Amino acid sequence: NRPYIRSKLGMSLDGRTAMASGESKWITSQDARRDVQCLRARSSAIMTGAGTVLADDPQMTVREAELPCELEAAPSIKQPLRVVIDTHLSMPAEARMLTLPGETVIFTASDSKSPKVMLDKAGARVIYLPNREREVDLPAACQLLAEEYEVNELLIETGATLSGAMLRAGLIDEMKIYMAPILMGNKTRGLFDLPNIECLDQHFPLEIVDIRAVGRDWRITAQPIYA
């Protein structure tokens, strides 16, 4: 039992998501970013990784001013649950999302007491959920979100490390890939961290179910085909 999991990704035409420094604002257009707000608005929770929090300090909220008019005029937009995968409990208690209304849940594989106390005081709920490799147990985390928080749609907005881990675990049901008409070169970061792929036979097949223009960008909807 787990939510339907949708991964939102932004990339250049040559498949890059950020500069080597981590700079990624903005690859895609404002139209694409408005479209992402619709994905957030329909999601019960938004998940990211500690690396994204440290690099970007995201709000992880639905920004109503950026929604299309028909959604912006809705009586109320419920803010999604914020979820952070933080293996080493490195997220600062001063993170911007912890100053905003709504709940934040942090899954960790670290039993360090001091950062947990600080994050608890900041209003987050820290859940210790390690697997055998001393990383966060991602399937168990998704199951807990469904059973304890009644999350039925989970949106992932994160970097290549967590995106790759979720894909390798068979936990991504759908990808929304926003492709910008720019080239970023080879000294940049890719979409997924998939270290075990050494030959073409080990590729991850996808089914493309929709492609459409969003402003100057293209939105590709794809579903992984798991063996």
Predicted regions and their residues:
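Enzymes that bind and transform nitrogen-containing heteroaromatic metabolites
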Residues: 3-227
